[in-house]
């Protein structure tokens, strides 16, 4: 047993992370609670926004993560390396589109314009040296969020009869990599 406590922290790299708060179909009391939470966050100087549609905000972030985490993990490359390769860049774009189609079928309300915004982030805003937590965990043989960023999407797509061929392929490929790393 260690003689000192372990300390953990999260380091934000880049400026694309943002905190959204809200409640789906909030009652008046729940809306007031969201405003109170917002005031607390503001008082602590934590930048955030109240989402008009929290489900759409969650799905939009999920769409980004499905492409970002899956492509970096599958190829064990940085964002810059993915951008430089026309094939992996095109796959990133396809994963964004497939994820959006699932969100649309699920009724999340993510605007279609988000597709190009997320793809634009990939080409112009993400740090070229960026890697993903999924990538680092898989290639280090640690437990990962593969089921969160790929398994769930593939299962939801099947449930909603949405074809996601590349997502299925990447999920299968990553499952094989994970089994070899174990």
Regions found by a protein language model. Give the residues of each.
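Rossmann-fold dinucleotide-binding core
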Residues: 1-57, 61, 67
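Short, contiguous strand/loop micro-motifs
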Residues: 24-25, 87, 121, 140
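NAD(P)-dependent Rossmann-like dehydrogenase/reductase catalytic/cofactor-binding core
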Residues: 93-182
């Amino acid at each position: 047993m260690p003689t000192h406590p372990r300390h953990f922290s999260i380091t934000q790299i880049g400026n694309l992370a943002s905190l959204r708060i809200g409640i789906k179909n909030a009652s008046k009391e729940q809306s007031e609670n969201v405003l109170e939470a917002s005031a607390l966050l503001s008082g602590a100087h934590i930048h955030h926004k109240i989402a008009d549609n929290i489900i759409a905000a969650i799905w939009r972030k999920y769409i980004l993560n499905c492409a970002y985490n899956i492509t970096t993990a599958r190829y064990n490359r940085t964002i810059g390396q993915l951008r430089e390769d026309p094939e992996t860049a095109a796959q990133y774009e396809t994963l964004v589109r497939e994820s959006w189609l699932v969100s649309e079928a699920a009724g999340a309300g993510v605007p279609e314009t988000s597709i190009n915004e997320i793809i634009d982030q990939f080409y112009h805003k993400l740090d070229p040296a960026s890697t993903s937590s999924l990538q680092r965990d898989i290639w280090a043989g640690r437990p990962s969020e593969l089921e969160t960023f790929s398994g769930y999407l593939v299962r939801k797509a099947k449930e909603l009869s949405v074809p996601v061929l590349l997502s299925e392929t990447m999920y299968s490929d990553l499952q094989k990599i994970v089994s070899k790393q174990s």
